[in-house]
């Protein structure tokens, strides 16, 4: 099933992770950087809207991704707005958001939307990983990886290959691969 997906991202770390996860399936990923306005709403609405806009912009099939980090004590915040919270507060600020709460549990959520082209309805693939928010540990190379702990290690402390077998992104991409095999 060798195929190429046009993945709308300007995040080199995200591109590398997606490419690594899909490589064994014979799916290659080409990055396309588009500056798309982001709808405010649920991660599903945001992902669908982004996929439709991207498909219109390039006139063909696209793959887009949106990631959430949901703190259970805050009823899902920062959720789909994690990029902006991360930019403004950093790792320590995110950890401090939970200082008054005993519950440090969180969920990493990744939603991919694949759209066949202009006017088509996107298909969603969502992966979730439960963990907890901890003070930063490990290299601060990729988003909030240093503060999201899964089974005793933060994503940042994990070997990339190990992370790519359990992450929210991996789970969503597994669903995408299954769908692509069923819809060649």
From Swiss-Prot:
Cellular component terms (Gene Ontology): cytoplasm; nucleus
InterPro entries given in the database record: ITPase (IPR027502), ITPase-like_fam (IPR029001), RdgB/HAM1 (IPR002637)
CDD domains per UniProt: HAM1
Enzyme class, first EC level, given as a word: hydrolase
Residues that hold Mg(2+) according to the record: 38
Keyword vocabulary terms for this entry: Cytoplasm, Hydrolase, Magnesium, Manganese, Metal-binding, Nucleotide metabolism, Nucleotide-binding, Nucleus
UniProt-recorded Gene Ontology molecular function terms: dITP diphosphatase activity; ITP diphosphatase activity; metal ion binding; nucleotide binding; XTP diphosphatase activity
Main location per the UniProt record: cytoplasm
Residues that hold ITP according to the record: 9-14, 50, 66-67, 83, 142-145, 163, 168-169
Cofactor: Mg(2+); Mn(2+)
Cofactor note: Binds 1 divalent metal cation per subunit; can use either Mg(2+) or Mn(2+).
Pfam family, one: Ham1p_like
Catalytically driven reaction(s): ITP + H2O = IMP + diphosphate + H(+); dITP + H2O = dIMP + diphosphate + H(+); XTP + H2O = XMP + diphosphate + H(+)
Cell compartment(s), UniProt: Cytoplasm; Nucleus
UniProt family annotation: Belongs to the HAM1 NTPase family.
Subunit structure comment from the entry: Homodimer.
Protein's UniProt name: Inosine triphosphate pyrophosphatase
Originating organism: Tuber melanosporum (strain Mel28) (Perigord black truffle)
């Amino acid at each position: 099933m060798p195929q190429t997906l046009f993945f709308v991202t300007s995040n080199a770390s995200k591109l590398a992770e997606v490419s690594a996860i899909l490589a064994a399936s014979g799916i290659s990923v080409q990055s396309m950087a588009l500056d798309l306005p982001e709808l405010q709403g649920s991660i599903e609405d945001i992902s669908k809207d982004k996929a439709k806009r991207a498909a219109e912009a390039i006139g063909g099939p696209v793959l887009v991704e949106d990631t959430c980090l949901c703190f259970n004590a805050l009823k899902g915040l920062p959720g789909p707005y994690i990029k902006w919270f991360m930019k403004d507060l950093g790792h320590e600020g995110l950890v401090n958001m939970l200082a008054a709460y005993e519950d440090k549990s969180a969920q990493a959520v990744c939603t991919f939307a694949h759209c066949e082209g202009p006017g088509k309805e996107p298909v969603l693939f969502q992966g979730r990983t439960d963990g907890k928010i901890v003070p930063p540990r490990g290299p601060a190379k990729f988003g909030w990886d240093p503060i999201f702990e899964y089974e005793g290690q933060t994503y940042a402390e994990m070997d990339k290959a190990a992370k790519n077998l359990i992450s929210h992104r991996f789970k969503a991409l597994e669903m995408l691969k299954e769908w692509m095999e069923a819809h060649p």
